[in-house]
Amino acid sequence: RRQRQMCIRDSLIPLFTVASESGDRDIPAEVAQLTDSLKKQFAPDRRVALLDIDYSFSDKNVMLRGVTTSAEAKNVLLKELARKGYTVMDCLELLPDVKGLEGKTCGIINVSVANMRVAPDFSSEMMTQSLMGMPVRVLQRDGWVRIQTPDNYIAWVHRVGVHPVTEEEMVAWNKAEKIVVTAHYGFVYSEPNQTSQTVSDVVAGNRLKWEGSKGAFYKVTYPDGRRGYISKSIAMPEKKWRSGLQQDAAGIIRTAHTMMGIPYLWAGTSSKGVDCSGFMRTILFMHDIIIPRDASQQAYVGEHIDIAADFSNLQPGDLIFFGRKATPERKERVVHVGMYIGGKRFIHSQGDVHISSFDPADELFDEYNLGRLLFATRVLPYINKEEGLNTTETNEYYK
């Protein structure tokens, strides 16, 4: 507690020269090199791991501020700074902030679609979205809540969007029988009829606690305890849904076709709107499959496939990637993804969800994307066999 008070007090008194770890000239070269090394080792992708450090120097005295999700990275940093002769005041916060969260280091998404942002502000760029009933890790609370989703993505969500719970409460939620929303869009009502007051909207993939049935409706409970009724025509019990689930390419492609015309939305991962990788993630999640969030992450799971000139080595359900091809001066860069559906055609979200073709003779020919085609990956055979490819039955967040 004394250390925390000193960190707060000293943050108000400019005794040190403040330097950011992002290359500020006031950081000694040996410290900058150490920081770069630790980031490469412990947080190479800040979408899923954090090591954000601000340094304040006064000769060989240094104050550390910022946050990290890696206890090991913090321990190595402190040890190496001491070895280099620095006297360290440690105000680097290890997430989750267990004390600040009062033990509620878990959470459940409490709105149909929760917008997740770079910073805790409505004007901040949206990074991704999460769906009602989804279990998350709560890392930090500052008016807004910093969470980590089952695909390990880290971002800020408004406090209304997530219901904080303890680990024990999370386990209870995960074990409870649930209703899964199967329609792209719908509502929960305050009474078992569609003329009553709405409680909220819902989208495909939302999960609510199942409390029983009344006529043509399921009685459900929200993560925060609200109650309502949802039509049996747009939802079903999770166990029944899972027993009839098809996780093959044909079934997933049929689901993809049901989203035709849905508008492109940057960072979108719901049937309200999707970006390219969000579309892949959404249609797979409708089949209980969890994959990494972004195209640049999805590109490196499953089996890599160098696409044949006639596309003969592709199979329906393969993910196909587009972007900047490698040159002697620049690395390859993935910026877009779609799903191969056969016959040299693919379905993707670009403007809206639609089908395009690699065949110049096809009326759906897409010359632009053919020109930036990179490679494909085959992910379906590797579900639950490779890190980053799993289901809600095996993902640690759902246990």
Predicted regions mapped to residue ranges:
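Beta-loop motif signature
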Residues: 109-132, 181-210, 264
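Boundary regions of SH3-family modules and the immediately adjacent low-complexity/disordered segments
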Residues: 75, 79-101, 121, 149-183, ...
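N-terminal targeting leaders
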Residues: 9-129, 134, 159-165, 237
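A generic structural signal for residues embedded in beta-strands
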Residues: 138, 210, 321-322
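Short, small-residue-biased leader/transition segments that mark boundaries at the very start
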Residues: 1-8
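Active-site nucleophilic cysteine motif
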Residues: 256, 268-287
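...with weaker cross-activation on analogous glycine-rich loops/strands in unrelated enzymes
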Residues: 291-355, 361
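Aromatic- and glycine-rich peptidoglycan recognition patches
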Residues: 164-167, 186, 193-196, 236-238, ...
